[in-house]
């Protein structure tokens, strides 16, 4: 378990004190903090060889763990739907993991926010036939050069095929593979583009980077993130969670209500 502040300091106090200036050096909980070179470039290199594992959840939903953000996979007669697309250099291992689930094509992709470790696979997945849906600020940030001061890195505008073709402002509902998906925008949270995805029948909840299991999330002030918004997002997640809900965090192991409670009180 990673701790970035003494136990007697609450999450709210830690965030308000600027503790996430330390977390800003970490792209993923697996730890890039010790790297002295460009952290983004290091993550891209790590992703080329990082193992991708598949965890089956329920109701035809699985999660892929790799070098970047956690990817949810919903299968069914409409083809695969993904939530997030990992780091671009992880393509071979992500593709193999998806094929290992079944041979159905990826038809739809939802981005929980614009960061490279959640949208890196957008282009190749779109070229393979997936339509891309996101909150409107994700498209805005991907459409132009965007600087993240916390990572000391400027991201060039994404290729045209990586840009979400359909966007929404606040909340959105989808019906795919016999499942109702509720998409909620947090304004702002760790960016200004964060959404969560609730697979309602399965009661599986993908939080994106509004929740990192057993770690503090990075706040991207450069693209609208805020301390208070991050806290409010955590409170909204906690208010939504049920006793039997499966929670897929942006980073870290799949958890549940106890993990969200821990995140809100530690």
Predicted regions: what they are:
Residues 53-99, 195-199, 204-207:
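Conserved beta-strand hairpin/beta-sheet module of binuclear metal-dependent hydrolase folds
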Residues 39, 43, 93, 100, ...:
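Non-globular, low-confidence helical/coil segments that flank catalytic cores
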Residues 1-10, 20-25:
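N-terminal secretory signal peptides
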Residues 54, 77-79, 89-133:
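Active-site metal-binding motif and surrounding structural segment of the metallo-beta-lactamase
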Residues 60, 74, 84, 113, ...:
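Divalent metal-coordination and catalytic microenvironments
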Residues 18-78:
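Zn-dependent metallo-beta-lactamase
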Residues 56, 79-80, 87-89, 138-186, 191-192, 200-201, ...:
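Metallo-beta-lactamase
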